[in-house]
Amino acid sequence: MTATDDCVFCRIVNGTLPASRLVETDTALAFLDIDPVTPGHALVIPKEHLPDLADLTDDLAGELLAIARRIADALRRSDLRCEGVNLFYADGEAAFQEVFHAHLHVFPRYDGDGFTINANWGTDPDRADLDDIATMVVDALGSE
């Protein structure tokens, strides 16, 4: 896919919008989010306009994660001294994706930062239900 004029991330890649760049390779770019959840909140994107997670090659997905890991390490070692990191990838409207250009969030975490992830982690599903879901996913993986 090619860059689109209405994609904010494509405009950052091509230099028509400013960004505080952190890491750049031939195929990926990382920069600070202009509306950060916490200080140091970064985004890691492919330079090519790829809207969805499924559009990424395995190599490119690995590169994005490797860059995110490097940034997480740097955030801990920097004067920001973050105490932890969350990686977050929203894929699709139901997952609250707002910019339809693949991107991985790197959220530095600090004690008392107020950022929360609200979910019902204690659903305690039935083993048979888990096995049924696993079968559906394995079948779909086999049809790739």
Give the label of every model feature segment.
Residues 1-144:
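HIT superfamily nucleotide-processing domains
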